[in-house]
């Protein structure tokens, strides 16, 4: 399939999910809980018949082998509740542009991932609130940003409310990826985040995230230290920002994101 066709197909899927938004009228009047801006996902789902959009702009800066690169993208997550404890998910980094010193500019569309999230249990009697996420990244992007085949991942998000308006989130996981020559390999995923509710509408967090834990032959471990804030404009709308600093040479030196999320 031509590389220009698949991004159009992804856009069609986004539009199709948006058409489901009117069904949100049958759901309860619950507030927004997002999966951004931190790496660790929320254990909660959006609720039956609810549609949630989480979109952003992301700028990354890196210097590797003497080449300075800046990459800009538009990470977006669409979530639709098909039940009280289950949601469908569509996620992509969207339009991606990289300026790499004397090597010129590379632009195109990132791959799209399809997934589900299952809210397993609420927090109670010392037990965390738990959610399970199963995603599959599809080789659907432009040639420059396209991965190799279907790459599945499984993550478990656990959250605890702590004294002093603090919260703790932990997310271990595993995934399967492919090298450029098609070789399959497995990798680990891990993140831990500590949040603080500053006011009823403001929260802040610090986080250590490892989206990929792998052998050096398979790209090595990618790890960041993150900090950010989120501001609830209303029960259904949130603004957020996050700064991420790379913890090793395999990770972009720095990244900054600004996001907007709303629930219908």
Regions found by a protein language model. Name each.
Residues 27-264:
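Transmembrane beta-barrel domains of Gram-negative outer membranes and organellar outer membranes
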């Amino acid at each position: 399939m031509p590389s220009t066709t698949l991004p159009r197909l992804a856009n069609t899927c986004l539009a199709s999910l948006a058409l489901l938004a009117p069904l949100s009228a049958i759901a309860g009047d619950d507030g927004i809980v997002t999966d951004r801006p931190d790496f660790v996902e929320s254990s909660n789902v959006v609720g039956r018949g609810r549609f949630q959009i989480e979109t952003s702009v992301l700028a990354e800066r890196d210097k590797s082998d003497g080449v300075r690169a800046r990459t800009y993208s538009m990470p977006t997550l669409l979530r639709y509740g098909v039940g009280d404890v289950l949601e469908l998910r569509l996620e992509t980094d969207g339009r991606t542009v990289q300026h790499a010193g004397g090597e010129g500019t590379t632009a195109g569309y990132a791959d799209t991932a399809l997934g589900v999230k299952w809210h397993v249990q609420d927090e109670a009697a010392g037990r965390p609130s738990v959610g399970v996420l199963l995603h599959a990244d599809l080789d659907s992007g432009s040639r420059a940003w396209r991965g190799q085949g279907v790459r599945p991942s499984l993550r478990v998000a656990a959250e605890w409310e702590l004294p002093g308006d603090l919260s703790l989130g932990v997310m271990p996981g595993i995934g399967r990826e492919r090298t450029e020559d098609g070789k399959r390999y497995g990798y680990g995923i891990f993140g831990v985040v500590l949040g603080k509710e500053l006011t009823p509408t403001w929260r802040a967090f610090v986080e250590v995230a490892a989206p990929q834990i792998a052998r050096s032959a398979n790209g090595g471990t990618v790890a960041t230290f993150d900090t950010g804030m989120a501001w609830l404009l209303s029960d259904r709308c949130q603004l957020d920002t996050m700064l991420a600093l790379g913890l090793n040479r395999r990770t972009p030196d720095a990244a900054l994101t600004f996001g907007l999320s709303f629930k219908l």
